[in-house]
Amino acid sequence: DGKYTFTMPDSKVTITPTFSKIEDTKPSKTGFNDVASSAWYADAVQYVTDKGLMNGTDDNQFSPNASTTRGMLMTVLARYAGEDTTGGATWYEKSMEWAKAKGVSDGTNPNADITREQLVTMMYRYAGSPKADGKLDSFSDAASVSSYAVNAMQWAVASGIVNGSNGKLNPQNNATRAQVAAILMRFCEMSK
């Protein structure tokens, strides 16, 4: 709390305080205060930040449990493709134009949170819509995958990009930044 108690002895005393800077301590190699080394997504966060695909939400925070927007994913994929994402009237404008031109996204709703099935669909399109031969029937919520996303989800499952959680794909759930980092890392490793 920054308070100190001093009891004056009976004789004359000289006190000389010494102050030293304490370096910021980071709980993980990522450099983000909110990403513990033991977190299931720590390696993925390190990977995507090292590759310049994702940044922190500020200098010390990654915000792993925050939602990811469609514009964020368009930007990440454009960066992965080597595109310059700087400039434009908005931070995502150049990425959105790239995503539309490449058929990755229709460019709508860039500020909307992205669902897991939308995430996988954009990545599937980025990959060139490869053959989708994965089975979804082992997931209890497979029927909740939207028809437009079925092939993409089958591909993502077969490729090991998406593992699901507790036997569910959660396709309608918003994708957190940690989930996006993990899926991106798997995608990049698969694409090598």
Residue ranges and their predicted role:
Residues 2-27, 76, 122, 152, ...:
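Conserved "repeat-terminator" motif of extracellular CCP/Sushi domains
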Residues 17, 48, 99, 126-127, ...:
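Proline/glycine-anchored alpha-helix kink/cap motifs
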Residues 21-42, 55-117, 123-149, 162-174, ...:
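Feature responds to low-complexity, polar/acidic, surface-exposed segments characteristic
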Residues 151-159:
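Short glycine/proline-rich, acidic loop/turn segments that cap or connect secondary-structure elements
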Residues 175-176, 183:
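Disulfide-stabilized extracellular recognition modules
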